[in-house]
Amino acid sequence: MLFLNAKFIDLDLGENAVIVNEDDLKGTSYYPQDRVLIESHAGSVIGNIYSTKTMVQKGEVGMLVSELAEISISEGEEVKLRHAEKPESIPFIKKKMDGQVLNPHEIRTIIDEIVSKKLSNIELSAFVSSTYINGMNMDEIGEMTKRIAETGDMISWEKNLVVDIHSIGGVPGNKYALLSIPILAAAGITIPKTSSRAITSPAGTADVMEVLTNVELKEDEIKRIVKTTNGCLVWGGGVNLAPADDIIINVERPVSIDPQPQLLASVMAKKIATGIKYSVIDIPVGKGVKIKNEAEGAKLARKFIELGELLNIKVECVLTYGGQPLGRAIGPALEAKEAIEALQDPKNAPKSLIEKALSLAGILLELGGAAQIGEGQNLAWEILESGRALEKFNQIIIEQGGTPKKPEEIELGDYIEEIIAPIDGYVTDINNTGITNVVKEAGAPRDKKAGLLLNSKIGNKVKKGDVLYTIYSGSEERLVSAVNLARRVYPVKVEGMLIERISKF
């Protein structure tokens, strides 16, 4: 047992940790990465030991701000460190690593210990990896989904008909929600849209919306906004909705994996938590996205529908084209700018963006009874073209604490590089993965001003020297890295009519 004085450390390690001077560890039974219980007069918290020579002095224990808040202690106060019990879920994680089926108790224990931070990031990574490799059956996924939802707040609504649109993502520039949500809200449909931040893409819906307004809102604020406007566009993590999901996502993000069991549970847990009764789920299909072909997409759609039945949520899925970015803008600020331009002048907006936004909104207009079957997309267009969607979008921005902006008022990265066509020809391919990696290298989504603007898309004719796309960044160093990557991976491919000259057999 160790008695040490707490010292505040302004550091975010993504998990609970205590930083101990290596001299205090000598001759004890405590070692780096040991799990310990930190106790004070006000409570206790579990963390893993990290050793240091200089960050804290002998007799001190470095504690992260989240831990200090969790047990309500002051800097300099004495705390006690003792060995914590091994998490109950460790054998269950090993069981899943061996490809075995987990029972409800085992699944609930894993999720509970994720939320209570009894599992280290290494242990959580092992669980995520095991589901990525070995998968889960529908009973396991259903149990995991319910427990993830139960770990946080549960929002209830006065109205019975509450709907939602969700995309599983993977498509760069997937900003459709900034059009679809205000279209539906303007039609009187209740649609409280909660989104995650980017996992595998350069910008999630929450990242894009955050360029324009506050997305970290509490439950009472969301209910007030939805009562006033019929809709919202907020970050689910700001509302304590399914907090286990956000912890899992933070482990998935560095390695850009999104295991299908977690994907299903993540999406549907948020639906349970936000009181959704009807949901349309967009499954992009194509090269460079999560789902490679229509057969895979149909299989995943059936799983969403089956899971929805287990959870008493009506789910309808749509397979959409994901073979190239949606619209021309990729990255938070650029996508926000393009979305506003589309709301202001839909006739001159990218057709792919308009078509997807109208199609998804149209389905829910029909499910919600605002339009007859087959007429939803027409009604969605009327709302968009009339300016009602823009008016509703600005109302949502104001209610969430922002100020409506004109497209030209949105700030982009100061460091810019244009990539030009090397030959005359046609754009024959746009590599989603390459585009995503280039934009991430430029700094997105953390750097909201970082992004990429496409001048040409697949099938467009270009001349040598034409600008294919422009990379933006808030950092000169990040821009150089992004440009170097772009020149290695060629995310936009141009080919001439002459493919190869053959003169010998």
From Swiss-Prot:
Q: Name one GO biological process term.
A: pyrimidine nucleobase metabolic process
User: Which GO terms fall under molecular function for this chain's record?
Assistant: 1,4-alpha-oligoglucan phosphorylase activity; AMP binding; pentosyltransferase activity
According to its UniProt record, the EC number is 2.4.2.57
**Gene3D superfamilies, A to Z:** 1.20.970.50, 2.40.40.20, Nucleoside phosphorylase/phosphoribosyltransferase catalytic domain (3.40.1030.10), Pyrimidine nucleoside phosphorylase-like, C-terminal domain (3.90.1170.30)
Question: What EC class is this?
Answer: transferase
Q: Quick one: a GO cellular component term?
A: cytosol
What the entry lists under SUPFAM superfamilies is as follows: Nucleoside phosphorylase/phosphoribosyltransferase catalytic domain (SSF52418), Nucleoside phosphorylase/phosphoribosyltransferase N-terminal domain (SSF47648), Pyrimidine nucleoside phosphorylase C-terminal domain (SSF54680)
Residues where AMP binds: G170, S196, R197, A198, I199, T200, S201, T205, S266, K290
Q: Of which family is this protein a member?
A: Belongs to the thymidine/pyrimidine-nucleoside phosphorylase family. Type 2 subfamily.
Protein name listed in UniProt:
AMP phosphorylase
